Structure formats: C-alpha cells, structure tokens
Amino acid sequence: FPFTERGTKAEDKQYTFRVEPSYVNALLDMGVDVASLANNHALDFGPDALLDTFTTLDEAKIPYVGAGATKERAEEAIFVEAGGRKVGVLSASRVIPVVEWNIENCQPGLFCTYDSTRLVQRIKEIESQCDYVVVFVHWGLEKKTYPEEYQRNLAKQYIDAGADLVVGNHSHVPQGIEYYNGVPIVYCLGNYIFNPNMMDTYALKVVWDVEGDTNLQVIPVDTREYLTGELKGDEAQAFYDYLEGISFGVNIDENGIVSYK
C-alpha cells in the first residue's frame, strides 16, 4: 500500500488502499530490510502517493525495490549482507490494473514482467555483483491454490538467468513450492496479515550452506484476529502436509524442512 495522505483514488478499481506514513514504524519494528513495491496497489492513489511512499521509506532508511521515479531506479537491485554473504534483491510485478502503471509507460511507475526479457537481463547483470540473487514477483490469480502455467515458465527463465531463489505473492492463499535445476520456487506465501477469513499462511526461513545450496524451512502461521502467530504441534503438521500436497515434487518434514524428491 502507498504511504500517503494525499492522491486521487484510481477509477474503476474495486479495492484501493493507502496508509498514513507514520505506520512505516511497523516495518521498522519488524526489522524489515527491504520493501518490495511491485504490486497492484502501489499506485492506487496516483503518482504523488507513490512518490510519498519513496520519501517515507527513504526517511525510515528502508531500501525498496520494484518501483521508482525513473526506469533505472525501478529496475534497481538492492544488496543486503546476510551471514557474511551478499544477496541481491530484485522485484517486479506481473499484475497491474492498467498499462500506465508500468515504468515503461509512466514515471513514477513499477518494474513489470509481463515480458520476462528485462527482468532476465537485470538478473544476469547483477549476478556477478553478489553471492546470491533473490527475485520477488507479484503474479498469479487471487484465491487460486495452484500457480498458472505462465508463473512456472517465468520462474524457470529467471533461474536460467541466474536467480538462486524465486518468491511470489498476490494470490492471498498459499501456493506450493517447486525446484528447478536445484533452485527453489515459492509460488506464493499467502498473507502475512490480512483478512481473517484467509488464515492459513507461512513464512520462510532461507539458509545458504557452505556449498551454496539454498535450503528452505517453512514456518506455518495463521492470522486469526488480525494477529500473526506461529502454528505448533498438530496444527503445524497439518499445514506441512497440506503444503506438500499442493507442491511439486517436494517433501516437507516435521520441522518444516523442505527437500526435493
């Protein structure tokens, strides 16, 4: 959502959102290192609201990806240090309500990936600048458990270009996990906090081992009463079983550790 108190609501859009800039403190309290802005709500209240979002995040010293005042900035990667290694983060959207939101058509705007060419190129450009490349993509259909075929095809193109992890969002419900050439694709994490009618979701712990392999641990959570809490015991196991069932060729053990068959 844009951090703003101004702007004009987008026409012919059922759901539009914005939040007071002071709520950026919630991201700070959570320890957010990078914010992804490539989604179908970033321009709900127009370009001024998106510019306010950039300002709010800059003042909070939270780097952002997936949007910018210029094409160069929207396509820019953010590099973060984790465990003594350098991780490059890119973000793009495959879901926007009108073509004018695409940075190719307006500024400010969003980095989009309806055509994979530009994101593939950016992955190749930053691969040599970091140890790992993580790609976040806003894609798919809302409330759909399984990814669309285009999601699977795009993810494989990103991995062929050099991505070490692909993580998606947008469907509002969890989607499964798949490995391609040993690289994990997490199609959708669901909602971290949202409508209480969509309670099942999960967080993801990522560990790169000394061989450079990407290891995943699923942390199952629910969002009852608009609060996110970790599932334990039988509830956690039920979620592991469910997620394994909607995934592609993976096992999830009793601790949430993911492996491919």
Where are these regions (language model features)?
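Acidic, metal/ion-coordinating pockets
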Residues: F1-K261
